Amino acid sequence: MALEIDFTDRVVLVTGGVRGVGAGISRAFLAAGATVIACARRPAEVAVEKAGRAIEFESCDVRDADAVGVLVEKVLARHGRIDHLVNNAGGAPFALAAEASKNFHAKIVELNLLAPLLVAQAVNAVMQRQAEGGSIVNISSVSGQRPSPGTAAYGAAKAGLDSLTSTLAVEWAPKVRVNSLVGGSVDTELSRLHFGDQSGVDAVGKTIPLGRLATPDDIGNCAAFLASPLAEYVSGATLLVHGGGERPAFLAASTADVSQ
């Protein structure tokens, strides 16, 4: 029997699901037949569509408990269930740890750690009442697993998100599976602002064993796998989607011509 991912008749909520990585996640679920509700603070400039189908957009600040409650109630009123949640909303601007304010650090942690917990709590309450339960995928980052200069609070928050994932997987089992998808560098508009032109993107790609940055669709496909029945025995896991990580610097030296 062929292995297939089919989300027909399934309802998926994707936070931050209208741009960049989030749009890639939304497209993956649309391609697999899901009804996708994508929330963000503002709608996308470009329609998020796949296989002739489009997302349903809802405006929501995921840091606001009341707004999250309204969002969940809207989804339930329209569809009667929530089968999968992908916590993708997050991010951080560059700021050195010694120079950023207390308020700046607090806001970064709020968006990247506390907000995913807030949304997960609201959706878990729904999933626990459903006969088939549900699954949650938290989008994390390699910044939480190695030094993250310039985004210290972000890296700390993502490390916390990975820890949170493993805890929720225990607390909310067996009805709800919870997993973390740890992304590496992804080729988006924001990454190009950070890395510069194509030559800058290519230079970063050369530091990755697979030779390129991830695409939003790479992340989306892996998120869909974690949410799917193919991963029905996977919970509390951390899936690294980083192209092999970062090539150690000594490997470049090891290719030098030492024959002379």
Annotate each language-model stretch with its function.
Residues 2-3, 146, 235-260:
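Short C-terminal tail/terminal secondary-structure segment
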Residues 18-19:
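Conserved glycine-rich cofactor-binding loop
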Residues 96-109, 204:
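Substrate-binding pocket helix/loop in short-chain dehydrogenase/reductase
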Residues 117, 212-241, 246:
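C-terminal substrate-recognition "lid" of short-chain dehydrogenase/reductases
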Residues 120, 157:
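Active-site helix of classical SDR
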Residues 125, 169-174, 232:
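Alpha-helical segment proximal to the catalytic Tyr-Lys
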Residues 141:
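Residue(s) in the substrate-gating loop at a strand-loop-helix junction
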